[in-house]
Each structure stands twice: as structure tokens, then as C-alpha cells.
Amino acid sequence: MATQVATPLSPSYTSELIIVCHHVLQHSPTPLTPHSLSFTQGFLLGQLSIALLIFFFIKFFIFGEPPSADDRSLHLNSLRRARTLAHQQSIKQLRTRSNSISLSLRHKDSRSIIRKGEETRGGPSIATILAKTYYNVKGHQPESLDWFNVLIAQTIAQLRADARQDDAILGSLTEVLNSGSKPDWIGEIKVNEIALGDEFPIFSNCRVMPAEDGFWYGPGTTGTEEGRLQARMDVDLSDVITIGIETTLNLNWPKPLSAVLPVALAVSIVRFSGTLALSFIPSSSPPSTSTTTPNPEHHRSNSTTSSSTSPPHRPTTLAFTFLDDYRLDLSVRSLVGSRSRLQDVPKIAQLIESRVHAWFDERAVEPRFQQIVLPSLWPRKHNTRGGATEDVEASEADLDEEVILEEEEEEEEDGGYTLPVPPQLRHPSAASTSLEAEGAKLREAEIRAGVRKQERPGMSRAQTSREEGVRYRPKPVSRTSEGWSGQKGMPGALAPGTFR
């Protein structure tokens, strides 16, 4: 069997084959590596996810439909009720603890100046008050409060009329909003719209009942006092009370005022309904610390010690609060931007509404309440009014006293000769007051014309007349005049030396 021997390739053919292979390798497409393929897919996926996030944020967060007013009201009422119940439970625990402590430290008076009534401690009980006023809490029908609505409507109408006369209320609100601490990213706030409404609140369904725990239990109480009576009434207001403001949102990064975004807001109260609770909190005085020790130093030390340990005096106050089932409907209009503007953004309305509810809850919704200190109801002379003549005399009493004192000083400087003023002239009428005013105007005109010298401060009329060369001689006192001179006593009389 013959063997085949491979013939070797020629050098020229080998070189051509190498050139062809090199050319094929250069022009063939480069295959994609796994690393480059995964980077491209990740980049595209990231861009798509960012776009989806922006889309959902704008659609559901900014332009999403807010829940209905009924749903929001129910949710807020449930939250407030839970807070009220928790507060009442804590008040009961605190009262039980304070009662156990104060039983052994109760103060006992050595004697009583005013005879006590049926109750040996504190005021009358709720049952006694209701029995003596013939009021049955369970059987008494609620009152309509029509008379109270008329009085409140007159007061509100007068306040609205005073506010519409000038723009003082706009300036006051602008000053209040810009005062105090304000974030740096909020610019100057300007009030550009205000509407006080045309309707009036209607109070109805008034009933009297014992006050609940926590309503009258304030910082000045010890928890051992008896219960109080409270009056509850329904309040309903359907009106449009609007306040509109303009401001700017400032972007202070990376440098101050890098960007400024104009914002215009208008908040309107559309409806308010709730239950108002009123209660009187009587005054409380510290216990008496009088002793029979004749030593003043010992008495001073006892009074100092007792004043440091006794509770402070609490005046009589009127407390009011709203129950947690109230409803407050707001309407918020917004305009954000300068060129491309966003109008009535729902999320901005929700944020403002939540802030308004929180502000009101922190001040006048149970368990929190407002206290107004009542003035003394004891009849006083300076508070007495009535009758046209009496009103004029009361308003001019202070002025008359000053005029009488000035006349007495002038007479003393004139040589010590005093003239008694008749009692009927100590309180001049309105006509005499107008005559005195005309006389003062005439004297001012003479001073401006140069006929009369102006009185220097600290000099009386008598001294000024002496400088002018005029000398006055006191008139004798007769029996009929009884020391009264018509030159000085007549109302509206001109001063001596007026005409030369």
C-alpha cells in the first residue's frame, strides 16, 4: 500500500492565506459582551422608573381627588373623641390621687365670721341649685335663644360696619401675619382680600347640665372641688368668610434667593356647626392665716410661710369650649407660579385645612378651653350711667376738677386772696363749656395778632398782667355775694386784661 506524502505549501500561498484571514477578522462585526448589555438595560430601566415616579406623584399626590367632606369630618371626629376620652381618664386618676392626699391636709378655720348655710364646705351643690331655681335637667325643654341671636347679630353687624369704613383691618392682619418667627423660605405676606360675610350665627337648643370631667379642671384647681353646671348650645353658621394672601416661596440654596415662586391663597370658611359649652368657674382665695399671736415678727414669719405654700388667688372666669364633634368646612383657592401657573392644587388645600383644624383644636376644642376673666359685678359709682345731665356731668367731672385747681393756684399767686366758688358753678353745663372754648379761641387770635402777649409756661395770668402794667385790686366781699365775684365765677367770662 502506497503511502501519501503531503506536499508542503509554498511560501507565497501561505502569506496570501494569512492576509485573507486578517482582513476577515477586521471586517467581521464585534459580538456584544454580557457586561455592555447589562449596563444598557439598567440605564433604560432607571430612566423609565424615574418617569413613572414623576407621573404618579403628579397624578395622585398633587392632582389627586381629596376625600369628601363627610369622610374627613368623620375621621377627624373619631380622632378628637379618642383624645378626649384619654384625657378624661387621666383626669379621673389624678383626681383620685389628689383626694387621697388632701384628706389629711385639709384646712380647718378656727372661726367663721359669716354664718354658713346648709353646706359646711364650699358652695351649694348642683342638686340644691337646680331645686331652688326650679330647673329639671331631665325634663326641661331646650331653649331657642332667639333673644341671644338678636344681640349677637347686632354686635357682629357693628363690627362689620366699623371694619368696612377703612382699610385698617387689612393693615392689622398684614402686620400680624408678618410679625413673630417666620421661616426663611417664606417671603413677605400681604393680605389682599378679606370678606366678613353677610350672615349671622344661630344659637339654639340650649340646655343646662353638669359639667363633664376635664372641662372646668384647670391649672388653678386641685381636683377636690365639686362639679359645676354648664350650658350647652348648638351653633350653626353658613356663610362665606374669606381671607386672601399673596406671598413668595424662596429657594435659598445654594445661595439666598436662588429661585422665587409666587403663591396666592384664598381661604374661606363655608360652614361651621358644633356644640358650645359654657361654664362659670368661681373665684378661689387662699386660706386664712390669721393668728392670735401679738408678736409682729412671729406674725410676719407666719404670713410669709403661708403665702409661699398657699395656692394663688384665682378670679371668677367664664370658660367656654367646643365639643369634639364640630364640623368646619373650608374652601381653599390657590395659584402657584408666575408664567406656567398651577391653579387649585388639591394637596395644598388639604395641608391648609389640616393646619386650620389643628390651630382650632389646640385652643378651643375639648379637653382644651378658653377662660375669660370676668370683671367685678359689685355696683360702683364710677360705673353708674343714666340720664343726659348725669352723663355730661360724669364725662366732665375730671375736667372741672383740673380747672378748679388751676384757678386756686392763680389766686394764691395773686396775693393769697381766695374767692369761694358757688356749688352750682362747679359743674358747668354744655353751654358754659362752649363759651369757654370760644373765649380760648379769642385769646389765641389776639396772641397771633400781637394785641396780647403769650403766656410763658410756668407763669399765671396774674403775673403776665403785672408785666403788662395792669394792676388789679381785690373787690370787697358783700353779704349778698357771699364771697363770689362774677368776674371770675361766671362761666365763659374772659380773663382779666383781655381788652386794654
Swiss-Prot record:
Residues 64-500 are cytoplasmic. One of its GO terms (cellular component) is ERMES complex. Residues 406-415 have a biased composition (Acidic residues). It is found in: Endoplasmic reticulum membrane. PROSITE patterns: SMP (PS51847). Component of the ERMES/MDM complex, which serves as a molecular tether to connect the endoplasmic reticulum (ER) and mitochondria. Components of this complex are involved in the control of mitochondrial shape and protein biogenesis, and function in nonvesicular lipid trafficking between the ER and mitochondria. The MDM12-MMM1 subcomplex functions in the major beta-barrel assembly pathway that is responsible for biogenesis of all outer membrane beta-barrel proteins, and acts in a late step after the SAM complex. Homodimer. Component of the ER-mitochondria encounter structure (ERMES) or MDM complex, composed of MMM1, MDM10, MDM12 and MDM34. A MMM1 homodimer associates with one molecule of MDM12 on each side in a pairwise head-to-tail manner, and the SMP-LTD domains of MMM1 and MDM12 generate a continuous hydrophobic tunnel for phospholipid trafficking. This is Maintenance of mitochondrial morphology protein 1.
